[in-house]
Amino acid sequence: MKKIGILFGMENTFPPAFVEKINSMKVEGVEAEFVKIGGIRMDESKKYDVIIDRISQDIQFYRAYLKNAALHGTIVVNNPFWWTADDKFFNYSLAHKLGVAIPPTVILPHNKHPEGTTDRSMRNLMFPLNWQELFDYVGFPAFLKPYSGGGWKHVYKVHTPEEFFHHYNQTGDLCMTLQRGVEFDEYYRCYVVGQEKVHIMKYDPKAPHHERYVKGNPPPSSAALRDRMEKDALTLCRALGYDLNTVEFAVERSVPYAIDFLNPAPDAEITSVGQENFDWIVNAAAEMAVKMALSGESPVKEMRWAGFLAGNNPPNAEKPTRKAKKVK
């Protein structure tokens, strides 16, 4: 029996719907359940063929468990080794090299010394910093935000150097980036599943959290824009090796700038994404997990971004599948 598990935290709707969907498909030899674990031996035998990870970014014990599970043959979505190493600034740099539109972005030294360090730890750091050069490169308005992490925490829109320093001086020992603000006239969040399927959702980041997914999900303003977002979303997720992710695009003058694409446990609660988007992600994720369980593929894939930089394009990036197949 092939067993699929889901590891989750505070979510209430996606995990049970995911399990129910897989079991209702009645695929011979495949079943799904909530992951149940205790203390883990280093030689723990494989209990799950596939695990969908929704929580290990917040709980170190789970992340360590998933790495060990992968070592013993479990396919983990998303790859716990790369997820541990990844950060948004690297992603911006990689995306830029891959030809995806990215606003000018810089990474900044910590405003305060990280715990356990002093000024002697910073002797390689230029002082004073070349602030004007950085401001000239990025431009204003700009967004000051952590180099990693999510949930719109510690994100500040700044219009002048004075506003920048006001907020930067409150960031403590967080490592921050400064990125040119995109004056967007359209904004989209895209689910990407299995590095194959893309679901574009009209999104309003300025609205209250429960109203950000625009009702009725109006389509992009042009077919060319839709195709560009699908292609770029697949390019990013294939390069980074993420099988479940969201990619956000802020569209300025018909150019989709990739703003946020490090979301390996993307929001999938029905209360925020709405029924139509919820149904899509449940179906697509369930089909992906079943396909993986039956595939017998290697649990840990090599990172492919290095090959892309060498000129090897993501396969079939120009032909994304837009909709998950309907499961009867």
Model-predicted regions and their roles:
Residues K2-F8, A70-G73, F81-Y188, V214-K231, ...:
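Active-site nucleotide/adenylate-binding loops and adjacent lid/helix of ATP-dependent enzymes
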Residues I51, V77, F143, T246, ...:
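Generic enzyme active-site microenvironment
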Residues G172-C175, G181-K215, E230-T246, A250-Y257, ...:
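Phosphate-binding core of ATP-grasp and ATP-grasp-like enzymes
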